[in-house]
C-alpha cells in the first residue's frame, strides 16, 4: 500500500460538480492499494499517518501530529500510485490491486483512521475526481507499507 501524505491548510474533492469531501487544516492522503496488500498494511499506514509529527509546535519545530492539532484527513483512492514506467512511456498498473479488493482495503483504511478519533472525509472510489488543495509548507511525505522508499 502506498500513500502520498500532504500537510494542507485546506483540501477538497469534487465529483460531477459536487464536493464529496472537504477539510480545513489536516492531511490529504492519496492512497494506492497493491495486489499483495492486506488489512495489516492499512492498519500500519493508518497508525503511521495518525502519528506523523509533521505539524509545527510553538517553537516552529515539526513535533505535532494531525491528532495533536485537531486536524482532519481527506483520503482519496489513487491506483496510479502503482504506475510502473520503467518500460516505455505509458504506465503499467499491473501491480495495483483489482478494484473490488482495492475498494475493500481503502474503506478499511478510512475506518482505521476514524477509529483513531480523526474526522476522515473521502473521495468517491473509482470516480473521476478533482482534488483541490492548499499545501502547507509544502510538506509531502511518501509512505509505503512494504518500505520500498
Swiss-Prot record:
GO terms for biological process: D-amino acid catabolic process. GO terms for cellular component: cytoplasm. Disulfide bonds: none annotated. Its main location: cytoplasm. It catalyses: glycyl-tRNA(Ala) + H2O = tRNA(Ala) + glycine + H(+); a D-aminoacyl-tRNA + H2O = a tRNA + a D-alpha-amino acid + H(+). It is found in: Cytoplasm. Homodimer. This is D-aminoacyl-tRNA deacylase. It comes from Koribacter versatilis (strain Ellin345). The gene is dtd.
Amino acid at each position: 500500500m502506498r500513500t502520498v501524505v500532504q500537510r494542507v491548510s485546506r483540501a477538497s474533492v469534487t465529483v460531477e460538480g459536487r464536493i464529496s469531501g472537504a477539510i480545513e487544516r489536516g492531511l490529504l492522503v492519496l492512497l494506492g492499494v497493491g495486489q499483495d496488500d492486506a488489512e495489516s498494511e492499512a492498519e500500519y499506514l493508518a497508525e503511521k499517518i495518525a502519528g506523523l509529527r509533521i505539524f509545527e509546535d510553538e517553537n516552529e519545530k515539526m513535533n505535532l501530529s494531525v491528532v495533536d492539532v485537531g486536524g482532519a484527513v481527506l483520503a482519496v483512492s489513487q491506483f496510479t500510485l502503482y504506475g510502473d514506467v520503467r518500460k516505455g512511456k505509458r504506465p503499467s498498473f499491473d501491480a495495483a490491486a483489482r478494484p473490488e479488493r482495492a475498494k475493500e482495503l481503502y474503506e478499511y483504511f478510512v475506518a482505521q483512521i476514524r477509529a483513531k478519533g480523526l474526522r476522515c472525509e473521502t473521495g468517491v472510489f473509482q470516480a473521476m475526481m478533482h482534488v483541490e488543495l492548499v499545501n502547507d509548507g509544502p510538506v509531502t511525505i511518501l509512505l509505503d507499507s512494504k518500505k520500498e522508499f
